[in-house]
């Protein structure tokens, strides 16, 4: 019997008008045995032509797209790229600034799956190493997600190249066991998310009527500057006012508290009620902010009154924290695989057996409404 040929390597197009950035990205990506940079381009028009001529035996799985480029910029090219191939996974690479942050969120609205800030100092080995870890993990997670959705095999990368936890888990074969939903109306809602999270979180909050008694705590893996922009976007786009959390802030109902970039967000009891504490303790799950420390602190304050939702994201951040939530008699809901951009975080939680429900994204808000009205999940 003939051995089947190995699956084609993950195909990547790098599109940036800076030759220095293209060189950095290409050197990082080509160092991975399961990656192949199909093209290194300097404007969006070239990316369109490259994608139009892609062949099945040499697929383009991921495009790394700059925003500001001559001839055709990234925001102009993005909808045309997705019209050519709706399955291609676009990651926007941008500088860390307010203007670039707003453009990155616009790209997410147009269909990009994720964004990644370019390294601040390309001469700093630590900065480049941290960027490498994030870039490789995101490219691999999104490429694997694309190929699974298309029923295509994908090559396995070397384990040591991705120090973050496995970005995505194998497709579920049997339904994970579910726990009974604890009785009682939730007193606080915690949400954790990563890759694909901005779109999912906005969709959830747009569908969830504001509840004046309910505070919502969100940890989304996101760099500084971007979190403030995202908080503004949540406030403008949903029923819920959102604020980037700061030290000592008193918790009130009807408000969304977003973990600030590069800080863990915790909640502590005080004589005047729950208060926000932000911390630069070490990263957890290679992340800061991380979901696990937020959940541990919330479980200690709210106990059985805490309801947790884990949305799309790579890695397994939130799994350990959800175990603490359940031990404190709280409840956990995970987004299902079919509607997740990357079923890493929710998949890890689902497989751990702590969920009371595993739901498609459109069903999460109606379920929360029923729970807030005293019904069953």
Residue ranges and their predicted role:
Residues 2-14, 18-34, 45-46, 50-53, ...:
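Conserved acid/base catalytic micro-environments in cytosolic active-site loops
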Residues 36-38:
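Short beta-strand elements in bilobed, periplasmic/extracellular small-molecule ligand-binding domains
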């Amino acid at each position: 019997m003939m051995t089947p040929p190995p699956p084609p390597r993950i195909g990547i197009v790098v599109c940036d008008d800076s030759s220095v950035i293209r060189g950095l990205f290409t050197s990082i990506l080509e160092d991975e045995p399961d990656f192949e940079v199909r093209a290194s381009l300097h404007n969006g028009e070239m990316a369109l032509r490259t994608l139009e001529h892609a062949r099945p035996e040499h697929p383009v799985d991921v495009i790394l797209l700059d925003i500001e480029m001559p001839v055709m910029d990234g925001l102009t090219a993005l909808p045309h790229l997705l019209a050519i191939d709706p399955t291609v996974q676009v990651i926007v690479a941008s500088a860390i600034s307010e203007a670039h942050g707003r453009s990155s969120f616009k790209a997410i609205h147009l269909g990009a799956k994720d964004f990644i800030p370019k390294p601040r100092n390309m001469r700093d080995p630590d900065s480049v190493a941290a960027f490498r870890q994030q870039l490789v993990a995101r490219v691999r997670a999104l490429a694997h997600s694309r190929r699974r959705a298309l029923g295509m095999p994908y090559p396995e990368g070397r384990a040591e190249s991705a120090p973050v936890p496995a970005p995505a888990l194998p497709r579920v074969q049997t339904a994970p066991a579910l726990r009974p939903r604890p009785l009682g109306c939730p007193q606080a809602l915690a949400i954790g998310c990563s890759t694909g999270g901005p779109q999912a979180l906005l969709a959830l909050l747009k569908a969830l009527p504001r509840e004046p008694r309910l505070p919502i705590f969100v940890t989304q893996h996101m760099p500084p500057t971007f979190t403030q922009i995202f908080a503004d976007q949540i406030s403008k786009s949903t029923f819920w006012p959102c604020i980037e959390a700061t030290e000592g802030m008193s918790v009130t109902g009807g408000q969304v508290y977003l973990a600030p970039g590069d800080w863990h967000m915790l909640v502590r009891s005080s004589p005047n009620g729950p208060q926000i504490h932000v911390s630069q303790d070490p990263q957890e799950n290679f992340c800061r902010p991380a979901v696990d420390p937020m959940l541990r602190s919330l479980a200690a304050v709210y106990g059985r009154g805490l309801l947790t939702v884990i949305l799309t994201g790579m890695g397994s951040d939130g799994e350990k924290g959800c175990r603490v939530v359940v031990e404190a008699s709280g409840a956990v809901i995970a987004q299902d695989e079919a509607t997740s951009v990357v079923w890493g975080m929710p998949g890890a939680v689902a497989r751990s057996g702590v969920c009371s429900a595993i739901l498609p994204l459109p069903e999460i808000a109606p379920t929360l409404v029923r729970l807030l009205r005293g019904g069953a999940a």
